[in-house]
Amino acid sequence: FSNSRKAEQNQVWVGMAKETAHQLGTPLSSLVAWLEFLRLKGMSSDYTNEIEKDINRLQTITERFSKIGSAPSLTKVNIHEVLKHSVEYIKTRSSDKVIFDLKVPATEVWAPLNVPLFEWVIENILKNAIDAMSGNGKIDVNITNQHQFVYIDICDTGKGIPKSSYKTIFKPGFTTKSRGWGLGLSLSKRIIEEYHDGQIFVKNSEMNKGTTFRIVLKK
């Protein structure tokens, strides 16, 4: 029963992901056309370049959704650069009251990743951290390089997670927010564990003090 139920859930996941990608496709095409129109009308390149960045980001998200359910290709990349890119992206779109601190080892750390999917995970955890801190606090991102494994710890100074919810938060539909589907952490778990053969879990959390998520990857 459990295997058939899991297969059924997988089909639902894949169906939702591909439908989301399909639904995003048409408005994205329109946005690209409108951007060209604004350029022809002489809008400042400062504005159009920022709009283009976000359109490209939407296209990346669409690509991510369309790939759910198929085996992603992994390429050995510098994790420092991937994390830096994700942190910078979220930083420019969050309050000045959120402090980001990325700590990396002196030597580069490389691991096989599907970069778009992995960035999805990091950005999702960072956004959750910002929500948990109500847009005011500090987020530390630390990389530890040990033998055949890489450990990535993302720590916030937010409201914390009760121990009884450490595993529940990774289940589809779980959310403490009034908005959204509560799919972010569940998707993150699938991406790390099923596609990257890694682990993601709550390392520790204290109520009203903060939470640390840990990602473990093989090198």
Task: Provide a role label for each language-model segment.
Residues 99-109, 146-147:
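Conserved catalytic submotifs in the C-terminal HATPase_c
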